[in-house]
A protein has these predicted regions:
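A polyanion-binding, active-site-adjacent surface
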Residues: 2-7, 11-279
Length: 279
């Protein structure tokens, strides 16, 4: 897609601390045409060495399809979530006791959206923190404000519809007790909720924000999942056939402003994928 920033988007990027550099028009249009052809053709092969003239637009590398998380030797409880609407799904999450995470829960962060419609964006974040647990919603407080600004710069927002819509969720719906890390079996258990969320949202793209969200979506690729998040960036993965782009969690960006430009590049890649899905 051709990235044309209006004054509002530039202001939002300044809010993120990103300095926007745009190439000369002729060069930019040439690269956009080349990238459009690549996306229509499925993108270059994994491990290709071709480089784009636009630094903020990483080349799309297609990885093998990622299937739902499965842990060897797991004995996860199969939840009866198939066919549930948003209200029933949220009620199930609020009363769920399928794993030990419920011991630390004040509120589930899986909430029925006000307008239950299809959204092109699904944003998956790390386990809920204290603010998310207290409010019962993903991406709360300053991290949530930063995410909202990032989405607005991409032309999307929470509660929007279709191309302008973004549904946000956590990799697990309950805050781990005593702020501990979630276990693999707990993430597998909660992945059943994510699979139903995906079925209801029907996203064109999943934006994985943070290392736990990324671990869930890349579990079938242990070599890639074991890499630092910074080395997982710039590649398009797939989860249940849906493109996945990896980037930093907003809480990390608030602490490390130098990574905001990298997050903007990831967002540009995500915008390209959403745009290509509409062609």
């Amino acid at each position: 897609m051709e990235l044309v920033l209006d004054d509002r988007q530039r202001a939002m990027l300044r809010e993120m601390g990103v300095h926007v550099w745009m190439p000369q028009v002729d060069a930019h249009e040439a690269v956009v045409a080349e990238r459009s052809a690549q996306l229509k053709g499925g993108g270059p092969r994994l491990g290709g060495t071709e480089q784009s003239a636009l630094p903020a637009r990483p080349i799309v590398n297609s990885a093998p399809a990622v299937v739902p998380l499965k842990t060897e030797g797991s004995s996860s409880t199969q939840l009866a979530l198939h066919g549930r609407d948003w209200q029933a799904l949220a009620a199930a999450a609020a009363s769920c006791q399928a794993c030990g995470l419920c011991a630390g829960r004040k509120n589930s962060t899986l909430q029925a959206p006000e307008s239950p419609v299809q959204c092109d964006w699904l944003v998956l974040g790390d386990p809920p923190d204290e603010d998310e647990d207290r409010l019962g919603q993903p991406f709360a407080d300053q991290a949530g404000l930063l995410l909202d600004n990032m989405l607005k710069a991409a032309g999307a927002h929470r509660g929007g519809m279709a191309r302008a819509g973004a549904y946000v969720s956590n990799v697990v719906k309950c805050r781990p007790p005593n702020a501990r890390l979630p276990q693999a079996a707990e993430m597998e258990q909660c992945a059943q909720y994510l699979q139903r969320e995906i079925a209801l949202v029907q996203p064109k793209l999943i934006l994985a924000m943070g290392r736990f969200a990324t671990q869930l979506l890349l579990q079938e690729h242990p070599q890639q999942a074991a890499l630092p998040l910074g080395k997982q960036r710039g590649t398009v993965y797939r989860y249940q056939g849906i493109p996945v782009v990896v980037t930093y969690h907003p809480k990390v960006l608030l602490r490390a402003s130098a990574d905001k430009a990298k997050a903007w590049a990831d967002l540009c890649l995500a915008m390209d994928i959403v745009e290509a899905s509409l062609q």
